[in-house]
């Protein structure tokens, strides 16, 4: 993530932040004491935008947000329901019934289904579209949970500004986007929102790419987008991968300037075809035989790597293999606090706002001097609080 953020501006990221960890601050997990660690917006300021599904939660946590995400019922398609089958316990016949409703009512299919159900006339709808009444009734009961989510609104209440178009403007301006879920961090909300937004953004990228290829105008070339998703097996299991946009993106191999960065603790749940498309894998300690077999599929010398995976330090080491390295290599991962310190040190080199507004001499003085005149590491540590204070003066702390 840090590599992408500090890159040359040609790559942007969209992070679906289920647990509110990437954007502003998160709880410190190591060291034996409770505390906070800085998120991407805190570290990189205006290079990162935060959108939220839960404005109240963001205000409570004093998170500076750039916009709130609201989804209207007419923005939800039947394909967006496919990843929810396990969460909603939807039978395949109910999904087939949804397709019948969509055929009859188009983008208003969900609103019409809810209207008939609320009126107690599922039987009338079933007769009208030729669907099984029991399947349609089950579909109504399950999707009622979706309609009751706080960020879902009727079609006539959707905001005038399309939130997806707003996010796209940020991305095409070179600004990375973190979408935090606040207290709406249920798997149901995560699967639904990630699929809806990623599907629409992918559709826009397809149009932009086709326009660029037709004109070969350099100004129309889309920025490469990396979409970050957690719990990837929920989107990319053998069933969902064939129906969701994430399976499409994985199979297209960056054809439309969109790539996936997938995070998962159960790689064995991911479709084999999708696993074969992953260019670079960063693997922490694994003990489950199925998971080990999944990540090593198609890799030379799997037996040797198998023993390495089982012996990795669970919090300090990872195995990197694939396109990014000439051969599999074990890497010691730095603590996040150490990474934050390094980012503070590198701000003057990487962030234009700091280059423009904090002169190099001032930055050097802040970094290497402290009141007690200590040298070496002590001077470095002593200057950090001053750097952070100056950072807040530059970008503000809402």
Question: Can you say where each PLM-predicted feature lies in the sequence?
Answer:
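Short, solvent-exposed amphipathic alpha-helical segments in soluble enzyme
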Residues: 194-198, 279, 299-300, 336
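Conserved P-loop NTPase motor module
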Residues: 315-398
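Short C-terminal domain-edge/linker segments immediately following a structured domain
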Residues: 29-32, 44-48, 83, 207-214, ...
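Short, glycine-/Ser/Thr-/acidic-enriched flexible segments
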Residues: 55, 184, 232-233, 267, ...
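Long, charge-rich low-complexity segments
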Residues: 135, 240-255, 368-376, 381
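Conserved ATP-driven motor cores of ASCE-family P-loop NTPases powering translocation/secretion/packaging/pilus
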Residues: 250-332
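Repeat-unit-sized solenoid/scaffold elements
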Residues: 7-9, 82-96, 118, 256-279, ...
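P-loop NTPase motor domains
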Residues: 1-15, 19-39, 43-248, 314, ...
């Amino acid at each position: 993530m840090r590599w992408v953020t500090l890159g040359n501006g040609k790559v942007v990221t969209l992070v679906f932040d289920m647990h509110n960890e990437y954007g502003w601050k998160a709880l410190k997990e190591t060291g034996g004491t409770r505390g906070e660690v800085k998120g991407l917006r805190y570290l990189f300021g205006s290079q990162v935008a935060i959108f939220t599904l839960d404005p109240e939660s963001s205000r409570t946590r004093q998170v500076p947000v750039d916009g709130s995400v609201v989804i209207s019922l007419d923005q939800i398609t039947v394909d967006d329901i496919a990843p929810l089958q396990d969460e909603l316990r939807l039978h395949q016949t109910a999904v087939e019934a949804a397709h019948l409703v969509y055929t009859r009512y188009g983008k208003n299919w969900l609103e019409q289904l809810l209207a008939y159900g609320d009126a107690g006339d599922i039987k009338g709808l079933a007769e009208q579209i030729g669907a099984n009444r029991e399947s349609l009734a089950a579909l109504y009961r399950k999707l009622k949970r979706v309609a009751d989510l706080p960020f879902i609104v009727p079609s006539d209440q959707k905001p005038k500004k399309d939130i997806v178009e707003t996010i796209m403007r940020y991305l095409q301006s070179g600004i990375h986007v973190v979408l935090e879920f606040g207290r709406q961090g249920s798997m149901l909300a995560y699967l639904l929102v990630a699929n809806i937004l990623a599907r629409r953004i992918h559709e826009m990228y397809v149009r932009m790419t086709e326009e660029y290829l037709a004109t070969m105008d350099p100004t129309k070339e889309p920025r490469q987008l990396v979409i970050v998703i957690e719990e990837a097996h929920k989107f990319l299991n053998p069933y969902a991968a064939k129906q969701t946009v994430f399976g499409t993106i994985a199979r297209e191999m960056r054809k439309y300037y969109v790539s996936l960065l997938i995070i998962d603790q159960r790689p064995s749940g991911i479709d084999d075809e999708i696993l074969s498309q992953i260019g670079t894998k960063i693997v922490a300690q694994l003990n489950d035989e199925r998971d080990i077999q999944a990540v090593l599929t198609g890799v030379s010398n799997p037996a040797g790597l198998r023993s390495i995976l089982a012996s990795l330090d669970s919090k300090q080491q990872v195995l990197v293999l694939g396109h990014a390295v000439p051969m599999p290599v074990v890497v010691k991962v730095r603590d996040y606090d150490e990474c934050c310190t390094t980012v503070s040190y590198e701000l003057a080199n990487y962030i234009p706002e700091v280059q423009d507004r904090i002169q190099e001499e001032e930055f050097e003085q802040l970094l290497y001097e402290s009141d007690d005149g200590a040298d070496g590491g002590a001077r470095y540590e002593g200057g950090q609080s001053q750097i952070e204070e100056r950072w807040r003066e530059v970008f503000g702390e809402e």
